Design a protein with these regions (language model features):
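Conserved NTP-handling cores and scaffolds of large molecular machines
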Residues: 26-29, 137, 141
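Short, glycine- and charge-enriched coil/turn segments that flank and shape catalytic ligand pockets
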Residues: 36, 121-123, 142
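His/Asp/Glu-enriched, well-ordered alpha-helical/loop segment
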Residues: 1-83, 95-98
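C-terminal regulatory/interaction regions
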Residues: 124-128, 132, 145-178
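C-terminal cap of metal-dependent C-N hydrolases
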Residues: 70-127
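Generic recognition of well-ordered alpha-helical segments
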Residues: 21-24, 51, 101, 107-108, ...
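A non-catalytic, amphipathic alpha-helix used as a structural packing/dimerization or gating element
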Residues: 43, 47, 51, 125, ...
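Flexible, glycine/charged-enriched surface loops at secondary-structure junctions
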Residues: 62, 140-148
Length: 178
C-alpha cells in the first residue's frame, strides 16, 4: 500500500511544509522498528508527488513533469547549504531542506514565488497588517483562554476515559509489543 503526503492545511502546525512531511515519513518508522524499512528519501518524494496526485484523483493532471500535465513545480537553489556539496537530490531534499532553497514555484505554469518571495501577495503590506492586528488578537486569545479554563478538567477526564476503551491495537507509536 502506498502512502500519500500532503501539507495544504494549517491545522497541524503553521510551519508545516512538504519537506518536513517527507522527512517525518522517513523518520517515524524508526521509532517502531529498528530494522531499515521501505520508507526512504526516494519513496518520500514519490509519496509527495505521484502518490499524492493519485490519492486525490488527479494523477492525470498533476504529480509528474510530462507533456499535458499542469506545470506545477518548485525550483530549488542548489547553492543553498542543504545542497552543498550536491550528491543525492532525494536525500538532500528530504533530510536537509526545509524550504530555504525554494527559489521559484509555478502553479499551472504561473509563478507564485519568485526569488524566494511571494509573487501574488505584497509581503510587506501583509506583515504591516499583521502587526496592526496583533494586539487585538492577543487580547482576544487571552479572553478565550480565561473563558475556556473551566473546560480543561472535564475535557481531560473525557479524553482519559476514551483512551481506556480498547481499539484492538496500540495507539502509541514506538511502544514495543510486550
Amino acid at each position: 500500500m502506498d502512502i500519500a503526503l500532503g501539507c495544504d492545511n494549517y491545522s497541524c502546525a503553521e510551519t508545516q511544509n512538504i519537506f518536513l512531511a517527507m522527512r517525518m515519513l522517513c523518520l517515524l518508522p524508526a521509532v517502531t522498528d529498528p530494522e531499515p524499512g521501505p520508507v526512504n528519501a526516494a519513496y518520500a518524494l514519490k509519496a509527495a508527488t505521484l502518490v499524492g496526485a493519485r490519492a486525490v484523483g488527479l494523477s492525470d493532471k498533476i504529480g509528474a513533469l510530462k507533456p499535458g500535465m499542469a506545470a506545477d513545480l518548485m525550483i530549488l537553489d542548489l547553492k543553498e547549504p542543504a545542497f552543498v556539496p550536491f550528491n543525492s537530490a532525494a536525500r538532500q531534499i528530504v533530510f536537509s531542506e526545509a524550504g530555504r532553497a525554494v527559489d521559484t514555484v509555478l502553479v499551472g505554469g504561473r509563478p507564485v514565488v519568485r526569488n524566494g518571495k511571494l509573487a501574488t501577495v505584497d509581503e510587506a503590506a501583509l506583515a504591516a497588517e499583521a502587526e496592526e492586528l496583533a494586539p487585538a488578537f492577543r487580547r482576544d486569545a487571552q479572553a478565550l483562554t480565561v473563558r475556556n479554563a473551566e473546560l480543561i478538567t472535564p475535557l481531560l477526564n473525557a479524553n482519559r476515559e476514551a483512551w481506556k476503551v480498547s481499539l484492538g491495537f496500540d495507539r502509541y507509536i514506538g511502544r514495543r509489543p510486550s
